[in-house]
Amino acid sequence: KQLEAASWYDALGDLFMALSSRKGQQAQGQFFTPVHICDLMVMCTETDEKKTGQRINDPTCGSGRLLLAYHVRHLGNYLVAEDVNRTCCLMTICNMLIHGCVGEVIHHDSLCPENFMDGWMVNHTLTQTGIPSIRRMSEEEYRTSRNMSVDLLRKRKEKLRQMQPDKKQLP
């Protein structure tokens, strides 16, 4: 049913939540965004503007379902998933492989990005070979990618300032 409605399915996230709720792990504060909310969030961000070639980030990715929801509606973007839980990172990698997403998955606390634990590049050769792939990300690649994300955020912030000159400036 979900595949018909949304064109994506997160079996790993559903299984993880079912198992963790039985073990009392909800005390850790881990709840995945419901599928219909992921779809709604993506729909709320839609404009007539082209949505390809962008870098889309989820700093608390869980099983990657918000990125999956974005991917099925906006193909051709680079997805960056981050989570402090290694199991969640591994589920996101699997989901990205299954759904043909290109990007990276970073295992770290996104509130302390200098503490890189691990990372993976997902499907970077998919467009050339048609074969899904995963490879370990080096810490140097992580730092380069992180700097790119920070630069993009600065540019977007500046663009917002220019669009709203009579409004209070963003910090």
Regions picked out by a protein language model, each given a short descriptive name:
Residues 3-4, 29-30, 80:
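Conserved aromatic-histidine-acidic binding/catalytic patches
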Residues 18-23, 44, 48:
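A short secondary-structure junction motif
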Residues 23-24, 76:
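Short, functionally important structural connectors and interaction interfaces within domains
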Residues 34-122:
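Conserved S-adenosyl-L-methionine
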Residues 95-98, 102, 106-171:
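S-adenosylmethionine
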